[in-house]
A protein has these predicted regions:
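Non-catalytic pre-domain segments flanking phosphatase-related domains
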Residues: 2-14, 20-98
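C-terminal cap/substrate-recognition subdomain and adjoining C-terminal extension
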Residues: 27-37, 44-48, 162-220
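Second-shell loop/turn segments in exported
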Residues: 60-71, 127-134, 156-162, 187-190
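Sec-exported extracytoplasmic/periplasmic mature domains
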Residues: 83, 87, 109-110, 146-154, ...
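Loop/turn elements at helix/coil->beta-strand transitions in domains of secreted/extracellular proteins
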Residues: 92-94, 149-156, 180-185, 204-206
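Metal-dependent phosphoesterase signature
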Residues: 111-137
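Short, acidic loop-to-helix structural element flanking the phosphoryl-transfer center
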Residues: 128-155
Length: 220
């Protein structure tokens, strides 16, 4: 899962004006002070608005019945479709690829902490969260993936988590009852590699790859 950090900065042009007119009238200084105060108020209002928006988004994700319903619907559709596909024999084993964050694992507690701290995503805090291995499975993911595993489907997790986070991620998945078919089935981000497409192609070369069911579960 990645979060875009937005930085909003207002640079006051009044600073140079105040220096140049330090010998001016008290009226001018008063006007400049009021203008500077107004700009500070704009900054606070914007920051407060952004914080409120982030809070509402996280609360909706965690509490809204629609969130659970959408995940369950997506994974139910994926399960039905997989059942149909498995009726057709294949020389290669069938496989599926999924992302992890917000597709299999729910990282909203990490987002909640960011809201409380007034911070955005950063790699250091994210790594601390991953090491806790406490993310819960999103609704429907466990049943779908267990069905796939029990029916001989190869499951690959293609994620932009780093390779140093593989062990903690395996620990988290196993705690949630999510099938892990080997370390080589967790295809994480390596130095110099950004695109997931190359990893998908590597899976496709040795298996009969069935798309990416996570697309059915994506919340739009």
């Amino acid at each position: 899962m990645k979060t875009t950090k937005t930085t909003f900065t207002i640079v006051s042009a009044l600073a140079s004006v105040i220096l140049l007119t330090s010998c001016g009238s008290n009226t001018t200084k008063t006007q400049e002070t009021k203008a500077s105060s107004t700009k500070n108020q704009v900054t606070m209002t914007y920051d407060q608005q952004r914080s409120q928006e982030n809070t509402m988004s996280v609360l909706w994700y965690q509490k809204a019945a629609e969130t659970k319903a959408l995940y369950l619907q997506g994974y139910n559709v994926a399960t039905d479709r997989l059942k149909e596909i498995l009726q057709t024999p294949s020389d290669k084993p069938y496989s599926i690829v999924l992302d992890l964050d917000e597709t299999v694992l729910d990282n909203s507690p990490y987002q909640v902490q960011n809201v409380k701290d007034g911070t955005a995503f950063n790699p250091k805090d994210w790594d601390v969260w991953v090491k806790k291995a406490t993310a819960k499975a999103v609704p429907g993911a466990k049943d779908f993936l267990q069905y796939a595993d029990q029916n001989g489907v190869q499951i690959y997790y293609i994620s932009d988590r780093t390779t140093s986070q593989v062990d903690d991620t395996i620990k988290n998945l196993e705690k949630e009852g999510i099938p892990v078919q080997g370390r080589d089935h967790l295809m994480f981000l390596e130095d110099g590699v950004k695109s997931k497409e190359g990893r998908r192609q590597a899976v496709q070369e040795k298996t009969n790859l069935w798309g990416q069911p996570s697309r059915l579960c994506r919340l739009l």
